[in-house]
Swiss-Prot record:
Zn(2+) 2 binds at residues 105, 142. The lineage of its organism: Bacteria, Pseudomonadati, Pseudomonadota, Alphaproteobacteria, Hyphomicrobiales. Belongs to the class II fructose-bisphosphate aldolase family. GO terms for molecular function: fructose-bisphosphate aldolase activity; zinc ion binding. It is an enzyme of class 4 (lyase). Activity is stimulated by Fe(2+) in autotrophically grown cells. Dihydroxyacetone phosphate binds at residues 199, 233-235, 275-278. GO terms for biological process: glycolytic process; reductive pentose-phosphate cycle. This is Fructose-bisphosphate aldolase. It comes from Xanthobacter flavus. It catalyses: beta-D-fructose 1,6-bisphosphate = D-glyceraldehyde 3-phosphate + dihydroxyacetone phosphate. PROSITE patterns: ALDOLASE_CLASS_II_1, ALDOLASE_CLASS_II_2.
Length: 354
């Protein structure tokens, strides 16, 4: 199956009331673990590359790894998504490289650190939407900044994220402003701020409504029912993985992620894309530490990475099943990007705003 537009997958998810984990990838082992999990569960896949991943692996390597996944797993619909594009130029570069979906994160200025104003965000996002939709590529925007409601601070990850203290007007997306934003930009998906943040250190305690505003999702979805909501920074940070890392010599302080049941609640209210990176990192790190501790003479990196892939695969299977995407791959027939471009041009995919 060819690469597909993220809009196609998220439309299907909305019609069938499920969510899709979007996994960040940096190397072959992560791609293979995710795709093996997708095959085991018959789930469609969103593979995404962050700015850090593009810097680490290089965009050509990421692009060809994902192309290999499409070839090796022909029964699985795959989206190749560029995560957190810092400018229209970055997004256009990704489109030219063959990405089928891009994110224009205009919540921050081009440096990826300074919070931007609303008008700037609308301007750059609308520009990317116009150019991307002309070739059938979907666009994710962002309104509000990722950050902790506990500390009032953003969380930089992979070279992207607000570095200054933020007030609640930035840390929580306003439903009325979300409606205005979607009407002005016509983005396909919208990343919203509800108290999540990148990285492993999201919450100092199991999150409740005062630090994780799941109820905000419902209010936003009521205003923009056809725009697919996105939860960034939504790894669950499994406590058993933290404990295993500590058991085999790691030093990770107490921390909590976004509980799976809270994500499931978000899916009921319109979340369709759930970004996950840290959980895979933790799974692979735990496996590598375990192999090294139990086999001190081992020096074949394949032994370490095979165990890491298997541990990551378990996490991915669990998320596909928990979010409801298992069993959906065979129900999807790929729509070519040229056809998506025609649908955008006809107005068929215009967003509904209340």
């Amino acid at each position: 199956m060819a690469l597909v537009s993220m809009r196609q997958l998220l439309d299907h998810a909305a019609d069938d009331s499920y969510g899709l984990p979007a996994f960040n990838v940096n190397n072959m082992e992560q791609v293979k673990a995710i795709m093996d999990a997708a095959r085991a569960t018959s789930s469609p896949v969103i593979l995404q590359g962050s700015a850090g991943a593009r810097k680490y692996a290089g965009e050509p390597f990421l692009r060809h790894l994902i192309a290999a996944a499409v070839e090796a797993y022909p029964e699985i619909p795959v989206v190749m998504h560029q995560d957190h594009g810092a400018s229209p130029a970055v997004c256009m570069g990704a489109i030219k490289s063959g990405f089928s979906s891009v994110m224009m994160d205009g919540s921050l200025k081009e440096d990826g650190k300074t919070p931007a104003d609303y008008d700037y965000n609308v301007s750059v996002t609308a520009k990317v939407v116009e150019l991307a939709h002309a070739v059938g590529v979907s666009v994710e925007g962002e309104l509000g900044c990722l950050g902790s409601l506990e500390t009032g601070k953003g969380e930089a990850e992979d070279g992207h994220g607000a570095e200054e203290a933020l007030d609640h007007s930035k840390l929580l997306t306003d439903p009325d402003e979300a409606a205005q934003f979607v009407k002005a930009t016509q983005c396909d998906a919208l990343a919203i701020a509800i108290g999540t943040s990148h990285g492993a250190y999201k919450f100092t305690r199991k999150p409740t409504g005062d630090i994780l505003a799941i109820d905000r999702i419902k209010a936003i979805h009521q205003r923009i029912p056809t725009t697919h909501l996105v939860m960034h920074g939504s790894s669950s940070v499994p406590q058993e993985l933290l404990e295993e890392i500590r058991t085999y010599g790691g030093d990770i302080k107490e921390t909590y992620g976004v509980p799976v049941e809270e994500i499931q609640e978000g899916i009921r209210y319109g979340v369709r894309k759930v970004n996950i990176d840290t959980d895979i990192r933790l799974a692979m790190t735990a496996a590598i530490r375990r192999v090294g501790a139990k086999n001190k003479s081992e020096f074949d990196p394949r032994k370490f990475m095979a165990a890491a892939m298997e541990e990551a695969k378990k996490v991915c299977i669990a998320r596909f099943e928990a979010f409801g995407s298992a069993g959906k791959a065979e129900k999807i027939r790929a729509i070519e990007l040229d056809e998506m471009a025609k649908r955008y041009a006809s107005g068929e995919l215009a967003q509904v705003v209340h």
